[in-house]
Amino acid sequence: MTPLVRVDHIGIAVESIADGEPLLELLGAEKLVHKRDDDQGFTWAYYELGNASRLELLEPIDGAESFLTGFLEARGPGLHHVTLEVADIEGTMAVLEEEGVRVIDYTERDGYLEAFVPPSEAAGVLFQLMEYTGDFQVEFGDKAVIGGSRLGE
């Protein structure tokens, strides 16, 4: 069975959110979230473009070692990941794994569940699979979820 999926957002690794933000503002983007994640060593800002497009800027926290510092050192700023919202992450993972696609790093976080399809499985692109839980909308509001509702609702 084909999983219920839609593009949620594109994540862009930057040295500085402040340096990346002016272009987004010129294009009419509205910042929905700006949050620091000390546990993972990065700050992220989430933007809405139109009513169905989202971009995320990811900036490393100074002095913190994280996935993002390694990424920026190896590749420089640019596309980090494409996030696909899924209605059922476990079902989606099962479908992919049955077809031989490797899925890694399944994690339950506050507000969402996530897993990743590594670039080696997806033409060089890191795909984040994300299933929102109720807490995400409570914390960040309906605009943080495309169309104000989670996929499959």
Model region roles, listed by residue range:
Residues 62-66:
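A low-complexity, Ser/Thr/Gly/Pro-enriched, surface-exposed linker/loop concept
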Residues 7-14, 23-24, 47, 52-58, ...:
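Short, structured motif recognition centered on aromatic/hydrophobic residues
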Residues 5, 33-39, 44, 97:
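Amide-forming acyltransferase catalytic core, primarily the GNAT-like/NAT-type
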Residues 1-21, 77-84, 134-153:
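N-terminal beta-strand motif that seeds the catalytic metal site of vicinal oxygen chelate
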Residues 71:
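Regulatory and interaction patches adjacent to catalytic/ligand-binding sites
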Residues 1, 14-29, 36, 43-50, 55, 74-153:
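Vicinal oxygen chelate
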